[in-house]
């Protein structure tokens, strides 16, 4: 479904005056639906390129690249009086916090709600299709949102992602209430508000982060590390994502095949003529010289937890899995992974200790705490 760019209902915000008007109207709203578009597939340092907000039948497409200072938007995002509706909010929040320092309070995530209700298809498109028969055109999902001017079709796409979020929230919220899961959902929404910003340095460049790296010989790992560092530096200089310089699979193929000339290098899968023309000699030299390196970065080895911790973790996981099957929801809806790991590691000995560990999850503590403590103490399997 394409949303027409009717100037009566769709407002392009690209200067201080239109931003001021937008914020004044949003201050009067009880809830706003929010989405963002970024350019992570096209640059080294990604950035938020659009912020879309729908409220009270109006949609605002805010252009951070042209508008300038967006700090007053924080009054909307941090207001406990205005509900912010997102779908799959985690990435949006991390990027908005990184780029603008926004804070968030009073949030509803339709993807989290759908998971908690046991929906099997939780993408926004399938949810709208299944719940309301609304079809979203997703062809611009991976578009370069950093280009200007944006086409009319891209703007229509941007508006469509927030246009129906309030309607979806109403339906999912009613179901959560009916199933008595509102309190658990609210816990997850509040935890989401406290998520950390995305890192300002976005990429790791270590050989063990590359799929297949741990299976290589030490010499091959050295060569792979050299290629990782070269790729990272070149990506920064050219302002491109590292994979557009050289893919992970191409780097592994290079170190495994150990080519001695550009002709052999060119024939490797994932390399090709364009890479060889630009980087051929450099790649061959790195592949050769880094094999002889005596020291390269190494991963920090994790100490094996004590047997008691491992046993407690497995008991908790088994209980969580069975409870998820019983309630027809993913297991981490029952108990988030990070909290499970903390409980397994600490091993609470009484209600008070467990309540402290689950301080951000009071609803789950009251619902499942007694059983969790039994399992932690190994009083019941």
Which residues does each predicted region cover?
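Short beta-turn/strand-loop junction motif enriched in small, turn-promoting residues
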Residues: 37-39, 113, 270
């Amino acid at each position: 479904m394409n949303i027409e760019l009717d100037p009566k209902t769709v407002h392009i915000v690209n200067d201080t005056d239109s931003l001021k008007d937008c914020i004044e109207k949003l201050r009067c709203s009880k809830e706003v639906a929010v989405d963002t578009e970024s350019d992570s597939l096209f640059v080294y340092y990604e950035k938020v390129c659009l912020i879309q907000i729908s409220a009270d039948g109006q949609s605002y497409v805010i252009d951070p690249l042209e508008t300038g200072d967006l700090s007053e938007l924080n009054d909307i995002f941090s207001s406990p009086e205005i509900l912010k509706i997102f779908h799959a909010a985690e990435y949006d929040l991390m990027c908005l916090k990184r780029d603008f320092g926004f804070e968030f309070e009073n949030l509803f995530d339709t993807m989290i709600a759908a998971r908690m209700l046991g929906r099997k298809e939780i993408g926004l498109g399938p949810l709208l299709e299944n719940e309301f028969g609304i079809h979203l055109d997703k062809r611009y999902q991976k578009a370069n949102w950093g280009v200007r001017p944006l086409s009319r079709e891209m703007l229509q796409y941007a508006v469509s992602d927030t246009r129906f979020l309030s309607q979806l929230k109403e339906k999912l919220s009613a179901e959560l209430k009916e199933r008595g899961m509102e309190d658990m959902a609210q816990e997850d929404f509040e935890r989401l508000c406290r998520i950390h910003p995305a890192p300002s340095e976005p990429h790791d460049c270590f050989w063990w982060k590359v799929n297949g790296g741990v299976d290589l010989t030490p010499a091959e790992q050295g060569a792979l590390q050299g290629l990782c560092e070269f790729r990272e530096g070149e990506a920064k200089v050219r302002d491109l994502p590292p994979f557009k310089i050289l893919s992970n699979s191409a780097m592994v193929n290079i170190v495994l095949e150990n080519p001695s000339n550009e002709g052999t290098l060119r024939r490797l899968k994932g390399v090709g003529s364009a890479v060889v023309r630009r980087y051929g000699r450099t790649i061959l030299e790195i592949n050769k010289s880094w094999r002889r390196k005596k020291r390269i970065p190494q991963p920090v080895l994790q100490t094996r937890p004590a047997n008691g911790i491992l046993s407690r973790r497995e008991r908790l996981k088994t209980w969580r899995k069975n409870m998820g099957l019983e309630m027809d929801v993913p297991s981490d809806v029952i108990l988030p992974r990070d909290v499970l790991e903390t409980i397994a590691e600490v091993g609470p000995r009484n209600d008070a200790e467990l309540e402290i560990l689950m301080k951000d999850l009071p609803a789950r503590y009251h619902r499942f705490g007694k059983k969790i403590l039994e399992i932690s103490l190994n009083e019941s399997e």
